[in-house]
Amino acid sequence: MNAETCVSYCESPAAAMDAYYSPVSQSREGSSPFRGFPGGDKFGTTFLSAGAKGQGFGDAKSRARYGAGQQDLAAPLESSSGARGSFNKFQPQPPTPQPPPAPPAPPAHLYLQRGACKTPPDGSLKLQEGSGGHNAALQVPCYAKESNLGEPELPPDSEPVGMDNSYLSVKETGAKGPQDRASAEIPSPLEKTDSESNKGKKRRNRTTFTSYQLEELEKVFQKTHYPDVYAREQLAMRTDLTEARVQVWFQNRRAKWRKRERFGQMQQVRTHFSTAYELPLLTRAENYAQIQNPSWIGNNGAASPVPACVVPCDPVPACMSPHAHPPGSGASSVSDFLSVSGAGSHVGQTHMGSLFGAAGISPGLNGYEMNGEPDRKTSSIAALRMKAKEHSAAISWAT
């Protein structure tokens, strides 16, 4: 077999198919199922099998290797019915219905190129499988050569591979999914009707007690705040109330009593702190009201224009005792006293300045009106200064 013979056969597949379906070949089919084509070397079994091998491998070595062997094997197949019976064991039965003829094959140059063959339609495959024998070996190698190298072409109406039909199915109009059923069973709070809203617990009417009932309840409450069941039942019979109402009244009465007790304790604590804070102020005010007359003012009391009641009431009167003031120096001693005391006698300094600047002063002024509330900070600072001076004087006198 050579390449020219293969090309000439592949160029005329229609003629071979016509010869296969002709009445002559059908009448001959009953005698020999292996002779589908007219006899001759061109359409013989040797030629077809050798051509199939040549198409499968496409080289001269394979054609030369399998040519002789196929000729030896094809000879007994064409001869007798005994060989036909032994060969029928391995061949499928011919199909009863004959499908329509397959479309014409592509040109010869497409067979020589890799990847030119495509997957044939189902009808052509059935025809090749059912024709049996050498007819099946005619075009199967061409289709099987590139069947696994590319993606198969699917018709447009076929479903995509790997997808489940349940995901592609369209929901019916009346059908509901599991989520829809769950949402339908649980009503939303906005869809509640008036009857459902009125199903809540009804508010109990407020119990109004008469004066007699309150008096009896208060009597028992004065005896005990926690009456037992028997006492509550007896009280309920006397007051014409239920035992539950009596129990609720005692609970409320105990809460009211605890609230009053708490409020009373707070008032007691508040009054205690207020009295403890106000008592020292009163004693200090009484001390300020007592005006102590120093000796240097008493000696010059008649000649001095400054009355004794105007002397500032300093809380530390000992500042004047260790220093002896000579008589007749009232103004100088007052100025010295003001300069020594400094900020401690700020109120007295202002009043003394006004007294010395004025020509005459009415003696109707008293010490309480002239002396305001002394500043605590300034008085403490002045006291510390005086104590420091006393300490330094004592140390110098001892040395």
Swiss-Prot record:
Transcription factor involved in skull and limb development. One of its GO terms (biological process) is embryonic forelimb morphogenesis. Residues 68-133, 171-206 are annotated as: Disordered. It comes from Mus musculus. PROSITE patterns: HOMEOBOX_1 (PS00027), HOMEOBOX_2 (PS50071), OAR (PS50803). Keywords: Activator, Developmental protein, Disease variant, DNA-binding, Homeobox, Nucleus, Phosphoprotein, Transcription, Transcription regulation. This is Homeobox protein aristaless-like 4. InterPro entries: HD, Homeobox_CS, Homeodomain-like_sf, OAR_dom, Paired_Homeobox_TFs.
